């Protein structure tokens, strides 16, 4: 998935309340440098051929996301986390050598380690390419394009982008079509947290909503009062659903 553009003023469509254009850029302080990372170490493993998704390669058969599958032999590593999880990191061989590949991987892994385990639990691989393209989630994976990553890092939104993409990877398949989530959507009377979620309710509503609910519950003091009020007014039933998921995954 791509990320919606930085939010404009709140949108009103008829009786529906949609407070944000997209939620990734609502706050760059949901996770920050003060948060601990569960990432502990990175181990080089033998390079082997892998199938990776690269957004720089056009596939005209897809109308929602630029990119295509490629088969290459990337630099391979295993990342270890203190909660016992492991992730295979696949770094495109366009990077100069093992040292550069490892350096680039490390720049993201500490941030990924800040994500709650709930958001990381289905992440089995990470793909890292050059290029200024959207990040992606799903496929038990996090997709990174390094030039865009440097922009997110500069602007302070790298953690929030990973929250969004990891929600796709670890939460979509469990919740996007669940009875409880659909009932919560209906009970919110046509409201969505963002214009992006409303446009793609099956594909984006989970990833747009869960990170802000996480912020409400665990990082509330980092959100502006106006933002809190907008979230709570727009999607009270989705908030209850998210909180029940957090409680059951403690």
Predicted regions span which residues?
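Bacterial Sec-dependent N-terminal signal peptides
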Residues: 1-23
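Auxiliary, metal-adjacent structural segments of Zn-dependent hydrolase domains
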Residues: 10, 41-142
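Structured segments of extracytoplasmic/periplasmic soluble domains
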Residues: 114, 118, 165, 169-173, ...
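Structural recognition of the beta-strand scaffold that forms the well-ordered cores
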Residues: 125-127, 143-145, 171, 205-213
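Solvent-exposed loop/turn segments at secondary-structure junctions
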Residues: 132-135, 149-152, 168, 176-177, ...
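Short pre-active-site segment immediately N-terminal to the catalytic Zn-binding motif
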Residues: 144-163
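Catalytic Zn2+-binding segment of zinc metalloproteases
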Residues: 159, 163-181
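Metalloprotease/metallohydrolase-associated module, dominated by Zn2+-dependent proteases
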Residues: 184-250
